[in-house]
Amino acid sequence: MKRCIVILVLVLLSVAMQAQKFPSWLAGKWEIPSVSMFSDSSFEDWIEVSKNHLESRTYRKFGDDTMYFDSMSMSIEKGNVVLKMYGEKDGKRFMADFIGKRLADEVWVFECAESDSPSAIYYQKLSDNEVYVWTEVRNDSYVCSDFIMYRR
Protein backbone atom coordinates (compact mmCIF):
# COMPACT_ATOMS: atom_id res chain seq x y z
CA MET A 1 0.00 0.00 0.00
CA LYS A 2 2.81 2.41 0.90
CA ARG A 3 4.45 1.64 -2.41
CA CYS A 4 1.27 2.55 -4.32
CA ILE A 5 1.00 5.85 -2.44
CA VAL A 6 4.65 6.70 -3.13
CA ILE A 7 4.22 5.89 -6.84
CA LEU A 8 1.03 7.96 -7.01
CA VAL A 9 2.74 10.93 -5.34
CA LEU A 10 5.71 10.68 -7.73
CA VAL A 11 3.40 10.55 -10.76
CA LEU A 12 1.44 13.59 -9.53
CA LEU A 13 4.66 15.51 -8.86
CA SER A 14 5.93 14.63 -12.32
CA VAL A 15 2.71 15.90 -13.93
CA ALA A 16 2.85 19.12 -11.87
CA MET A 17 6.50 19.73 -12.81
CA GLN A 18 5.76 19.04 -16.48
CA ALA A 19 2.99 21.66 -16.46
CA GLN A 20 5.46 24.24 -15.15
CA LYS A 21 7.96 23.36 -17.88
CA PHE A 22 5.66 24.36 -20.74
CA PRO A 23 3.87 27.69 -21.35
CA SER A 24 0.46 26.12 -21.96
CA TRP A 25 -1.13 29.41 -20.84
CA LEU A 26 -0.51 30.64 -24.41
CA ALA A 27 -3.31 28.40 -25.72
CA GLY A 28 -6.19 30.45 -27.11
CA LYS A 29 -6.93 33.28 -29.51
CA TRP A 30 -4.97 36.51 -28.96
CA GLU A 31 -5.57 39.92 -30.49
CA ILE A 32 -2.69 42.29 -31.24
CA PRO A 33 -4.24 45.75 -31.66
CA SER A 34 -2.90 47.83 -34.53
CA VAL A 35 -1.02 51.02 -33.68
CA SER A 36 -2.21 52.52 -36.97
CA MET A 37 -5.70 53.87 -37.52
CA PHE A 38 -5.47 52.58 -41.10
CA SER A 39 -5.19 48.86 -40.35
CA ASP A 40 -7.02 46.26 -38.30
CA SER A 41 -5.74 44.12 -35.47
CA SER A 42 -3.58 41.05 -36.00
CA PHE A 43 -4.22 37.74 -34.27
CA GLU A 44 -2.28 34.76 -32.93
CA ASP A 45 -4.28 31.55 -32.52
CA TRP A 46 -2.48 29.05 -30.29
CA ILE A 47 -4.21 25.66 -30.52
CA GLU A 48 -3.44 23.00 -27.94
CA VAL A 49 -2.65 19.85 -29.93
CA SER A 50 -1.64 17.97 -26.78
CA LYS A 51 -0.52 18.81 -23.26
CA ASN A 52 3.00 19.68 -24.47
CA HIS A 53 2.35 20.77 -28.05
CA LEU A 54 0.86 24.04 -29.35
CA GLU A 55 0.35 25.12 -32.98
CA SER A 56 -0.17 28.76 -33.98
CA ARG A 57 -0.90 31.00 -36.92
CA THR A 58 -0.46 34.77 -37.02
CA TYR A 59 -2.81 36.60 -39.34
CA ARG A 60 -4.77 39.77 -40.06
CA LYS A 61 -8.35 40.04 -41.33
CA PHE A 62 -9.27 42.45 -44.13
CA GLY A 63 -13.06 42.24 -44.43
CA ASP A 64 -13.69 38.72 -45.73
CA ASP A 65 -10.01 38.19 -46.62
CA THR A 66 -7.32 36.80 -44.33
CA MET A 67 -3.58 37.44 -44.69
CA TYR A 68 -1.41 34.84 -42.93
CA PHE A 69 1.98 36.02 -41.69
CA ASP A 70 3.51 33.03 -39.96
CA SER A 71 2.90 29.53 -38.63
CA MET A 72 4.52 28.42 -35.40
CA SER A 73 4.80 25.24 -33.40
CA MET A 74 5.83 24.80 -29.78
CA SER A 75 6.61 21.42 -28.26
CA ILE A 76 9.00 19.59 -25.99
CA GLU A 77 11.88 17.97 -27.87
CA LYS A 78 14.72 16.17 -26.10
CA GLY A 79 13.76 17.83 -22.81
CA ASN A 80 13.68 21.37 -24.27
CA VAL A 81 10.71 23.56 -25.11
CA VAL A 82 11.23 24.42 -28.79
CA LEU A 83 9.44 27.14 -30.75
CA LYS A 84 9.63 26.45 -34.49
CA MET A 85 9.05 29.46 -36.70
CA TYR A 86 10.69 31.39 -39.50
CA GLY A 87 13.85 33.31 -38.75
CA GLU A 88 16.03 35.35 -41.07
CA LYS A 89 19.76 35.11 -41.76
CA ASP A 90 21.57 37.18 -44.41
CA GLY A 91 18.24 38.27 -45.88
CA LYS A 92 16.93 34.71 -46.30
CA ARG A 93 14.05 33.16 -44.37
CA PHE A 94 14.44 29.68 -42.91
CA MET A 95 12.55 27.46 -40.47
CA ALA A 96 14.36 27.94 -37.17
CA ASP A 97 14.33 26.19 -33.81
CA PHE A 98 14.14 28.69 -30.95
CA ILE A 99 15.10 26.99 -27.68
CA GLY A 100 12.94 28.06 -24.76
CA LYS A 101 13.99 28.89 -21.25
CA ARG A 102 11.74 29.95 -18.39
CA LEU A 103 13.25 33.06 -16.80
CA ALA A 104 10.53 33.43 -14.14
CA ASP A 105 7.15 31.88 -13.39
CA GLU A 106 5.43 33.66 -16.27
CA VAL A 107 8.36 34.78 -18.47
CA TRP A 108 9.79 32.67 -21.29
CA VAL A 109 12.57 33.49 -23.75
CA PHE A 110 13.08 31.56 -27.00
CA GLU A 111 16.51 32.00 -28.61
CA CYS A 112 18.06 30.90 -31.89
CA ALA A 113 21.79 31.43 -32.48
CA GLU A 114 21.39 31.00 -36.26
CA SER A 115 18.72 33.67 -36.71
CA ASP A 116 19.52 37.37 -37.08
CA SER A 117 15.88 38.41 -36.88
CA PRO A 118 14.48 37.62 -34.51
CA SER A 119 17.32 36.27 -32.40
CA ALA A 120 15.14 36.06 -29.28
CA ILE A 121 11.42 36.20 -28.55
CA TYR A 122 10.09 36.88 -25.06
CA TYR A 123 6.60 36.02 -23.78
CA GLN A 124 5.59 37.48 -20.42
CA LYS A 125 2.18 36.59 -19.00
CA LEU A 126 0.82 39.79 -17.44
CA SER A 127 -2.55 38.27 -16.54
CA ASP A 128 -4.81 35.46 -17.76
CA ASN A 129 -5.89 37.79 -20.57
CA GLU A 130 -2.71 39.75 -21.41
CA VAL A 131 0.71 38.68 -22.68
CA TYR A 132 3.58 41.07 -23.38
CA VAL A 133 5.74 39.97 -26.33
CA TRP A 134 9.04 41.48 -27.44
CA THR A 135 11.84 40.50 -29.78
CA GLU A 136 15.57 41.04 -30.03
CA VAL A 137 17.69 41.09 -33.20
CA ARG A 138 21.40 40.57 -33.89
CA ASN A 139 21.75 42.96 -36.79
CA ASP A 140 21.01 46.71 -36.68
CA SER A 141 19.39 46.56 -40.11
CA TYR A 142 16.45 44.66 -38.56
CA VAL A 143 13.76 46.11 -36.31
CA CYS A 144 12.84 44.86 -32.84
CA SER A 145 9.19 44.82 -31.91
CA ASP A 146 7.07 44.70 -28.80
CA PHE A 147 3.33 44.50 -28.22
CA ILE A 148 0.67 43.28 -25.82
CA MET A 149 -1.67 40.48 -26.90
CA TYR A 150 -5.19 40.33 -25.45
CA ARG A 151 -7.15 37.08 -25.09
CA ARG A 152 -10.31 36.99 -27.24
Segments (PLM) and residue ranges:
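Edge beta-strand at a domain terminus
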Residues: 93, 97-100, 105, 129-152
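Central antiparallel beta-sheet cores of small beta-barrel/beta-sandwich binding domains
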Residues: 32-114
